[in-house]
Amino acid sequence: VLFRSKMAGGILLGFLAVAGIVTGSQGSVTVYAAEELQGSGTAEDPYVITGSEDLWKFAEIVKASSDRNECAKVADGVTEIDTTVRGEKKDLTWNPIGDSSGSYKGVFDGNGAEITIHADRSINNNAGLFGILGSGGEIRNVTTAGSSKGWDSVGGICGQACSDAKIVNCNNKADITAQGGQAGGLAGYASSAQIESDTSISNTGAVTGTANVGGLVGQASGGMKVIVHEG
């Protein structure tokens, strides 16, 4: 069993048949169709993520969904995804999947890939690859790298994990900064959630905050569990 840690002191738009631009008084927004991703987004037939573009599209699909329970899996053979690059665009700031308007309730399988993010929410909460994991939400088999910054509830995998959400076989290399509190390598805050691994759980990113700072979880409550299966 291995634990490693490095610490330092609206408008709802529906899906279109094809991608397009919707314009209005507030400007324009690109709308991506679910059909652009391989798979149907169910647990049995998850969306297939082949790179950064697909991951950005998946995030947009989830945000436009009323249920936010879409599932996705990184394709076999994909070992690294850098979300700071999307097509010709570079140095992008990642928008966490799932937030206070609706937590993520699907299953995301990183399939062993390392995903680099630059999540900078500054004065806002819930920064990470995912913002808030809710009931039924599960993130598995992924390592986060890069940086995650916010006010409260900041982690590499997610800002918050609540209501029986699960983080399975995940690790973090990203530097975590909470300008307020609740900073953790995997999750800033966890309540009634479960962190589980078949081998080890690790954080090698620097974790900083003014209060409630932890290598894996900044603040835990409600019977949070950490389970490591041996043998």
Named regions from a protein language model:
Residues K6-Q26:
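Sec-dependent N-terminal signal peptides of Gram-positive bacterial secreted proteins and lipoproteins
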Residues S28-G231:
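Surface-exposed repetitive/solenoidal architectures
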